[in-house]
């Protein structure tokens, strides 16, 4: 097959040339070993035309083409050295015995780096980053010249900027940027001046002092928890109980001048108070009298009296004193003359309470009169 193709090529070339050309043209068959290929298949197609023409692979050749010898390690994949399937260095080096005319440029081995398909630079060095612009430091003389021009105009034209730039030995772009920043600073100062009085009034205005709320006044139910500093201490002497003055209460129907009372009157008032309290069925009768005697002028005789329920019992003279002050503060003083003769002034507490109960049981008609 190869011999027939070689002969056909020679005959075509000899017929196309003249006899003089045929003498000069000495066509000899080319051995496959010199081309770097063996005689075993597969084989490539060859173009029978001009010998200086570069070989073309079979997949780019029109159908019916002739076979051409070409190294197999470059045929199936033109960029075999960068093919990730084979890896780096897995393929043999290209055959250097082929003449340069038979090495097609698209089949030239490309020595690429490992990341050349992703990076634009084949040397593996990243492009230099954009350097940060250096800040310009103005001297005092430069600032004086710029401030002088700014006082004349805030928007200098290109000619004025160039003139000033030459004077202070700076580029014109730096002068332009300085004017831009200076205008922004001026606007900021104007805004602060406009908002200055308002902001100063709001920030420097003293905070209103917190009003100290007075302590809550004790209610009438809480009155037993407080003590009166004007209340004289109790003394178990009959002279004090008989001569103790009484404070007129604003709740009494008529203010009556205090009068000295004897022990008999005190006993009568005590019995009257106990009977009246039994008729009204008010608990804690005796502490009510003591509660009024301490100076708490209140019309409520039975409210909040548990405070005095744990107090020790006082002698008879103190009971007489508390009973007298309680009766003088209320309208019940008018009932003292209507009662029967009282018991002895120094009667014990137990006997007095039993006598009170007896008096309350023996005189039902008096109860209705007191109401």
UniProtKB/Swiss-Prot annotation:
Residues 1-63, 182-269 are annotated as: Disordered. It comes from Strongylocentrotus purpuratus (Purple sea urchin). It comes from the Eukaryota. InterPro entries: HD (IPR001356), Homeobox_CS (IPR017970), Homeodomain-like_sf (IPR009057). Transmembrane segments: none annotated. Belongs to the paired homeobox family. Bicoid subfamily. SMART domains: HOX. This is Homeobox protein OTX. GO terms for biological process: regulation of transcription by RNA polymerase II. Residues 188-206, 224-249 have a biased composition (Low complexity). PANTHER family: HOMEOBOX PROTEIN (PTHR45793), HOMEOTIC PROTEIN OCELLILESS (PTHR45793:SF5). The gene is OTX. GO terms for cellular component: nucleus. Pfam families: Homeodomain.
């Amino acid at each position: 097959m190869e011999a027939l193709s070689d002969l056909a090529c020679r005959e075509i070339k000899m017929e196309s040339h003249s006899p003089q050309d045929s003498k000069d043209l000495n066509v000899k068959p080319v051995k496959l070993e010199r081309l770097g290929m063996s005689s075993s298949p597969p084989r490539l197609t060859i173009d029978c035309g001009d010998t200086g023409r570069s070989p073309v692979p079979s997949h780019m050749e029109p159908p019916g083409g002739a076979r051409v010898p070409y190294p197999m390690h470059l045929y199936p994949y033109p960029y075999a050295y960068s093919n990730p399937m084979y890896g780096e260095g897995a393929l043999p080096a290209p055959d250097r015995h082929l003449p340069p005319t038979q090495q097609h440029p698209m089949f030239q081995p490309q020595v690429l780096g490992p990341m050349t398909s992703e990076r634009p630079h084949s040397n593996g060095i990243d492009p230099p980053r954009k350097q940060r612009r250096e800040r310009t430091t103005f001297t005092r003389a430069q600032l004086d010249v710029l401030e002088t021009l700014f006082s004349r105009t805030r928007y200098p034209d290109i000619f004025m900027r160039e003139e000033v730039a030459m004077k202070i030995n700076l580029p014109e772009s730096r002068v332009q940027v300085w004017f831009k920043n200076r205008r922004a600073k001026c606007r900021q100062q104007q805004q602060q001046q406009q908002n200055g009085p308002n902001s100063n009034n709001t920030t420097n205005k003293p905070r209103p002092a917190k009003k100290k709320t007075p302590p809550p006044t004790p209610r009438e139910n809480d009155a037993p928890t407080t003590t009166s500093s004007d209340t004289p201490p109790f003394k178990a002497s009959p002279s004090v109980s008989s001569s103790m003055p009484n404070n007129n209460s604003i709740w009494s129907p008529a203010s009556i001048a205090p009068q000295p009372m004897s022990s008999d009157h005190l006993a009568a008032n005590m019995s009257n108070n106990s009977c009246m309290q039994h008729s009204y069925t008010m608990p804690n009768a005796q502490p009510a009298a003591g509660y009024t005697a301490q100076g708490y002028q209140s019309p409520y005789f039975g409210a909040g009296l548990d405070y005095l329920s744990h107090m020790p019992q006082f002698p008879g003279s103190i009971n007489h004193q508390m009973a007298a002050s309680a009766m003088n503060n209320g309208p019940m003083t008018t009932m003292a003359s209507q009662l029967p003769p009282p018991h002895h002034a120094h009667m014990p507490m137990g006997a007095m309470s039993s006598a009170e109960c007896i008096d309350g049981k023996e005189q039902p008609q008096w109860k209705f009169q007191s109401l």
